[in-house]
């Protein structure tokens, strides 16, 4: 049997391999039990037996050659195909790389498109503004300072700039602005708390713990008066006096009616009942506050804690 439409190169390789394998096959098939005799001494039966053996041997040899040829053809086909396509693994790698690159580009395009849609879509706009922390400051003041147009897409709002604008309100100590998806803007403020008051020609001015003059209003009850020449957040005597005031125990601070600081080294407190506390400098404020809380339980008019190691009562 033969196969048709095969590559001539494969046929040549297969035939050569089959011939090499065929030469290794035994050619003689005569029985070992029967010694070979000269043909002229053979009888009819022996000659017929020999001819049958030769035919069987020839048939077996032909079958072996055909099988070897087919096996060699299969091996040759695989070898030639691999030789003709040596760069196929590399080509597969290139295809995989191109697919990965294409997927990355598609994802990037989708991401950019989604970002642009969110940036411009009215569905995610500031339809509501939530303000938290207002008390003395009104909602209208915050909205006026924020300057956020209704229905502005949330991603177009610079939250830091809005917070900075809100923080310019005198009574606002700090402001924070957050987007609340899908359609709200949240503004959280912390108002300044007055700790001292100072009289000016235009009325009483309120100062917070940082020395910021944030309001011109009547002071809350029991707020101590501030006796400093040039009060302000950068004034050394203002900082020193407020440091002393914030170091006092709450039960002592509530009794202070006035705090005076002609200099950073000569701070004095006047209590609501007229008693005077000589504080001195801001050194060892915590120790002085502890000593003063104990001394005020004793009768006297003047309490000197400028030297906390030797406090005195007069």
UniProtKB/Swiss-Prot annotation:
Its main location: membrane. Disulfide bonds: none annotated. Coiled coil: none annotated. Residues 2-99 are cytoplasmic. Residues 1-57 are annotated as: Disordered. It comes from the Bacteria. GO terms for biological process: cell septum assembly; FtsZ-dependent cytokinesis. It is found in: Cell membrane. The chain crosses the membrane at residues 100-120. One of its GO terms (cellular component) is plasma membrane. Keywords: Acetylation, Cell cycle, Cell division, Cell membrane, Membrane, Transmembrane, Transmembrane helix. Essential cell division protein. Belongs to the FtsQ/DivIB family. FtsQ subfamily. HAMAP family: FtsQ_subfam (MF_00911). This is Cell division protein FtsQ. It comes from Mycobacterium tuberculosis (strain ATCC 25618 / H37Rv). The lineage of its organism: Bacteria, Bacillati, Actinomycetota, Actinomycetes, Mycobacteriales. The gene is ftsQ.
């Amino acid at each position: 049997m033969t196969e048709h439409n095969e590559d001539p190169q494969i046929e040549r390789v297969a035939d050569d391999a089959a011939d090499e394998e065929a030469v290794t096959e035994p050619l003689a098939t005569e029985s070992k039990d029967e010694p070979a005799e000269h043909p002229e001494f053979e009888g009819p039966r022996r000659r017929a037996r020999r001819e049958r053996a030769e035919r069987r041997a020839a048939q077996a040899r032909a079958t072996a050659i055909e099988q070897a040829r087919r096996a060699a053809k299969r091996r040759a086909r695989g070898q030639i195909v691999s030789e003709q396509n040596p760069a196929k693994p590399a080509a597969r790698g290139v295809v995989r790389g191109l697919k990965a690159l294409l997927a990355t580009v598609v994802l990037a395009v989708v991401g950019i498109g989604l970002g642009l849609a969110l940036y411009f879509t009215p569905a995610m706009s500031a339809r509501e503004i939530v303000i938290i922390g207002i008390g003395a400051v009104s909602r209208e003041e915050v909205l006026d300072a924020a300057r956020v147009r209704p229905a502005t897409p949330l991603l177009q709002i610079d939250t830091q700039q809005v917070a900075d604008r809100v923080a310019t309100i005198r009574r606002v100590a700090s402001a924070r602005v957050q987007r609340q998806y899908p359609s709200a803007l949240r503004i959280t403020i912390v108002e300044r708390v007055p700790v001292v008051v100072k009289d000016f020609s235009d009325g009483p001015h309120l100062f917070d713990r940082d020395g910021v003059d944030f309001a011109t209003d009547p002071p809350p009850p029991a707020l101590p008066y501030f006796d400093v020449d040039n009060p302000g957040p950068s004034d050394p005597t203002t900082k020193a006096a407020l440091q002393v005031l914030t170091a006092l125990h709450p039960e002592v601070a509530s009794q202070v009616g006035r705090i005076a600081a002609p200099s950073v080294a000569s701070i004095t407190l006047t209590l609501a009942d007229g008693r005077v506390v000589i504080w001195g400098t801001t050194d060892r404020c915590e120790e002085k506050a502890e000593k003063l809380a104990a001394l005020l339980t004793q009768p006297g008019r003047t309490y000197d804690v400028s030297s906390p190691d030797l406090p005195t009562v007069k």
